Design a protein with these regions (language model features):
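Extracytoplasmic
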Residues: 3-255
């Protein structure tokens, strides 16, 4: 493509990868050859994540562009080659990925991604040192989108679906999310909702927490995961189905 989708001069840490991927512009053969010995151009974690997303897309018949994978731009063509075959450009990833990860509100990006991005891959960033806990990078990669830190919101439109064996890559599905609404306990300013979630990957079992502000005695919050949600400190629970998450349905908690 032209403009900022055209190949730019990369930094030296990307040269080997892009040299191997350059052939995609004229045919997939040279790209495939470059990926055969994947250790030369991509990490095992990247390969593992790409293969998992590819299998998921095949199993669920996810069409393109709903199958588009947003990742670090230097690996973006690898993911999309495996997953959907649309690997000619990394321009969109280069424009949006870092801005998204280092913003403080993942769900504000949902409208941008809704018809453009199906999956987001996060990665370990040890070389950057301290990363604010409020960033999307930390919320997704370290906490699977859960509001486990009381003053930092979780996410309602990014569902954790996979973690690699070493935990270096996490995969999130962009979803409409289900909205839970209902009456709040008396004299409560915020309601805490919790569901137990398990995804493929070692140790990938976690409590998915969302917090909702109470207005006029009621609360409303969007959740990215299906499951049984425990409401506040009492015995109240609500079931959120897979369909509700995928279709953006509202689930009402009875009073």
């Amino acid at each position: 493509g032209g403009g900022d989708d055209a190949l730019a001069v990369p930094d030296r840490t990307r040269v080997a990868l892009l040299a191997g991927l350059a052939g995609v512009a004229v045919g997939s053969g040279s790209l495939y050859a470059a990926l055969i010995d994947r250790r030369l151009v991509i990490t095992d974690a990247t390969y593992e994540a790409a293969r998992w997303i590819s299998a998921y897309v095949d199993e669920h018949d996810v069409p393109y562009p709903e199958s588009y994978v947003l990742s670090k731009w230097g690996r973006n063509r690898v993911y999309n080659y495996f997953v959907n075959g649309e690997a000619a450009s990394y321009g969109y990833a280069r424009r949006t990925y870092e801005d998204f990860l280092f913003s403080n509100d993942a769900d504000s990006w949902h409208e941008e991604f809704a018809d453009r991005v199906g999956f987001v891959v996060t990665r370990d960033l040890p070389h950057l040192g301290l990363i604010s806990a409020s960033t999307v990078q930390s919320t997704l990669h370290d906490r699977y989108g859960s509001a486990t830190i009381s003053n930092i919101g979780g996410v309602g439109h990014f569902r954790a679906v996979f973690a690699t064996d070493d935990g270096a890559r996490k995969v999130f599905r962009v979803v409409p999310g289900a909205t839970i609404s209902g009456p709040a306990p008396a004299e409560t300013a915020r309601v805490r909702l919790v569901a137990d979630v398990s995804i493929p990957g070692p140790g990938a079992e976690f409590e998915y927490v969302r917090r909702a502000t109470v207005t006029d005695g009621t609360f409303e919050v969007t959740v990215a995961n299906p499951g049984t949600y425990r409401i506040g400190q009492g015995d109240a629970t609500v079931e959120v189905s897979e369909r509700a998450v995928r279709a953006g349905e509202t689930v009402t908690l009875d009073s």
